[in-house]
């Protein structure tokens, strides 16, 4: 049993416990239950309360004696007798069950809506009749006064099947394209159908007329919600004559009063998953809504969360046992969960012992690996030398490895490594010796990194400990895990030769000296029993101020000295680099021509002129051979041409002519620099 406490509400998971491997036979399971205490003490409230693979629907009969569940694979329905706490019967079906309902007080009359459009009517002995509906069905509801079954599905029509006459009646035509869910109010028998457009249509079964239309899509959307599409109705449930709860495909539950089109309250599951089931708990005024991930219980008046359940597997259906605190869920897993919440109500009459048992039980988390078997991978099998056992009964394939008996594993492990116990023993002895050493008087060892800083911190700690007055101990950096890396990682080593450290060190040292002096003065003041404002003896305030100014001058001079030294060192390094550059002799660099290339001189102009006289087709062929032209196909199917343009000969000649003309103009120009004007008449003319 697993116990969880959500919002101060205890939830007991009666299905959680040590499970047995599926490959074991019934005889071995019984033998294991006798030997293993954990298996024997686990709580199996109802025997074989599970499905082969997945359970899709679960319901309780109106008399409370029978629990019926549908699942797969293969499609089947199982009936459990609560008085006997065991399986009463099991029936296999031809197709998966979409929805089923119990029409009688016990299990004698059941209707199954299957995924292949068939509807099966079962009696106490088995299948009574089988018929088909025109469209694929998604939900149905039974109207007790008229014995009519209302089927909804992938159609705009609501099909009516009268069980008294044994024939179909006229269908109800809706405005929707498809209908997901339907329900009938037990008080006044109002029929409601939830559509994919996010609307709820209400019909009167007596007149077969629509009496109301409610748009829930806009009501479920709030200001702080992000909705990608139009929400459709995925769940529908009446509560009393006036209230109706609507669940949407985007994860909202909206509560309505039938007299108004405005919602009383809207609750968001915050997961964005379709609401699959809605139940009401009348005693505490709670709404139990469930999507595939979570089951939430909240107050229908103010929306305050009462508690919530998050199963390990996805939820398909939820059933609340009447007048109790027991909850059943159909999951995407073989085991169907049974939850007991004492805050909701007492345990049912057939398991009243739970009230006394839950007080004594403690939380036992479910084990994911069987204790009697060891999970090993193929690599571990190779290391143990057991690869030849693959395929034998000693190894059971599971996921990416195998299950093997734990006793066999220990034997093989001891044979492969016979000294494992000796190594384990030595390790334990070493741990005991280290624990004993820790109790002795320890000498403080300096760390490998930042030894000077650690020594300084040790000295400050000793000075504080030697003081007479007891002060509150400040946390030490050496013992703080946050600064542990600073004394272990060499990357945090303080470089005392760096420029920043040498400039800051005089200032830091002077500040520490001033701090020590102030501490001594404060100690003297505390020791004296004179007046509070009395100055220290033999030390007036003027002398103290003059001393502080002298200290400031001292560290300023020290900083200047360090700056001067740094400049000198930088100058020396530059001179050394220049000297090294002068001493190094530069050697000529040789370049190797690639294989297949030829050295060409500058006398290829004639060849280029001949090439320019040729046609474009001939030039393209020559350029492709030389490699200066690149033609490639693109992904779309076109071609891409890449080439290099060269200057024309005429353009080059024109540039040379312009250059020659400018030089001639410079030679023929006559300068007027020898002409000078008088200073009084203005600037000289140049």
UniProtKB/Swiss-Prot annotation:
Q: Does the keyword Coiled coil apply?
A: yes
The family line of this record is: Belongs to the WD repeat NOL10/ENP2 family.
Q: Which PANTHER family match?
A: NUCLEOLAR PROTEIN 10 (PTHR14927:SF0)
Q: Where is the composition biased (Basic residues)?
A: 667-686
Q: Where is this region: Disordered?
A: 526-590, 649-686
Q: Which Pfam families match?
A: Beta-prop_NOL10_N, NOL10_2nd, NUC153
Q: Which GO terms describe its cellular component?
A: nucleolus
Q: Where is the composition biased (Basic and acidic residues)?
A: 551-582, 655-666
WD repeats mapped onto the chain:
50-90, 174-213, 228-266, 270-308, 310-349
Q: Which UniProt keywords apply?
A: Coiled coil, Nucleus, Repeat, WD repeat
| Record's subcellular location | Nucleus, Nucleolus
Region forming the signal peptide: none
Identify this protein by name. Answer: Nucleolar protein 10
Sorted alphabetically, which Gene3D superfamilies does this protein's record hold?
Answer: YVTN repeat-like/Quinoprotein amine dehydrogenase
- Determine the domain of life of the protein's source: Eukaryota
Top-level taxonomy: Eukaryota, Metazoa, Chordata, Craniata, Vertebrata
Coiled-coil intervals: 420-470, 555-587, 639-676
């Amino acid at each position: 049993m697993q116990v969880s406490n959500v919002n101060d509400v205890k939830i007991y998971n009666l299905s959680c416990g040590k499970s047995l491997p599926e490959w074991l036979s019934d005889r071995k399971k019984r033998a294991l239950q006798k030997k293993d205490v954990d298996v024997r003490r686990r709580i199996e409230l109802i025997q074989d309360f599970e499905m082969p693979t997945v359970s899709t629907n679960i319901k309780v009969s109106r008399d409370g004696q029978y629990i019926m569940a549908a699942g797969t694979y293969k499609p089947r329905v199982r009936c459990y007798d609560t008085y006997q706490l065991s399986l009463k019967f099991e029936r296999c079906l031809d197709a998966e069950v979409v929805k089923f309902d119990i029409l009688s007080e016990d299990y004698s009359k059941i209707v199954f809506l299957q995924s292949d459009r068939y509807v099966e009517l079962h009696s106490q002995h088995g299948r009574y009749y089988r018929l088909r509906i025109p469209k694929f069905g998604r939900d149905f509801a039974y109207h007790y006064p008229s014995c009519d079954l209302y089927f909804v599905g992938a159609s705009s029509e609501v099909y009516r099947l009268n069980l008294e006459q044994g024939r179909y009646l006229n269908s109800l035509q809706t405005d929707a394209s498809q209908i997901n869910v339907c329900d009938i109010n037990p008080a006044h028998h109002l029929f409601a159908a939830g559509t994919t457009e996010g609307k709820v249509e209400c019909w009167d079964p007596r007149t077969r007329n629509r009496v109301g239309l409610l748009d829930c899509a806009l009501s479920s959307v709030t200001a702080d919600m992000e909705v990608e599409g139009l929400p459709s109705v995925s769940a529908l449930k009446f509560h009393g004559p006036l209230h109706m709860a609507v669940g949407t495909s985007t994860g909202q539950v909206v509560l309505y009063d039938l007299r108004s089109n405005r919602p009383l309250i809207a609750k968001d599951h915050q997961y964005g998953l379709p609401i699959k089931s809605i139940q009401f708990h009348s005693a505490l005024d709670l709404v139990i809504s469930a999507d595939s991930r979570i089951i939430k219980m909240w107050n229908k008046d103010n929306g305050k969360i009462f508690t919530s359940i998050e199963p390990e597997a996805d939820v398909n259906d939820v059933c609340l046992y009447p007048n109790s605190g027991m909850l059943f869920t159909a999951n995407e897993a073989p085991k169907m969960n049974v939850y007991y919440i004492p805050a909701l109500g007492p345990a049912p009459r057939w398991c009243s012992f739970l009230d006394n048992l839950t007080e004594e039980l403690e939380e036992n988390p479910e084990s994911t690996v069987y204790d009697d078997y060891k999970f090993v991978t193929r690599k571990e099998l190779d290391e143990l030398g057991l690869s030849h056992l693959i395929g034998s009964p000693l190894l059971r394939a599971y996921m990416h490895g195998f299950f093997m008996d734990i006793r066999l594993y220990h034997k093989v492990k001891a044979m492969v490594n016979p000294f494992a116990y000796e190594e384990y023993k030595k390790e334990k002895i070493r741990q005991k010796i280290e624990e004993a050493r820790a109790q002795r008087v320890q000498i403080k060892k300096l760390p490998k990194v930042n030894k000077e800083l650690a020594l300084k911190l040790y000295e400050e700690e000793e000075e504080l400990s030697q003081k007479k007055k007891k002060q509150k101990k400040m946390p030490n950096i050496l013992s703080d895990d946050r600064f542990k890396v600073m004394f272990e990682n060499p990357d945090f080593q303080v470089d005392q030769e760096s420029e920043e450290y040498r400039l800051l060190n005089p200032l830091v040292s002077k500040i520490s000296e001033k701090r020590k002096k102030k501490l001594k003065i404060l100690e003297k003041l505390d020791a004296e029993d004179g007046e509070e404002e009395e100055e220290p003896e033999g030390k007036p305030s003027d002398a103290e101020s003059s001393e502080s100014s002298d200290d400031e001058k001292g560290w300023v001079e020290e900083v200047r000295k360090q700056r001067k030294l740094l400049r000198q060192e930088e100058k020396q390094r530059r001179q050394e680099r220049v000297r090294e550059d002068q001493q190094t002799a530069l050697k000529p660099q040789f370049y190797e021509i690639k294989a297949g290339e030829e050295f060409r001189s500058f006398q290829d102009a004639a060849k280029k002129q001949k090439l320019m006289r040729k046609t474009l087709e001939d030039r393209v062929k020559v350029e492709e051979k030389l490699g200066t032209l690149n033609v490639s196909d693109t992904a779309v199917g076109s071609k891409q041409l890449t080439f290099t343009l060269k200057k024309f000969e005429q353009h080059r000649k024109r540039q040379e002519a312009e250059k020659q003309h400018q030089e001639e103009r410079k030679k023929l120009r006559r300068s007027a620099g020898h002409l000078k004007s008088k200073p009084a008449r203005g600037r000289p003319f140049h």
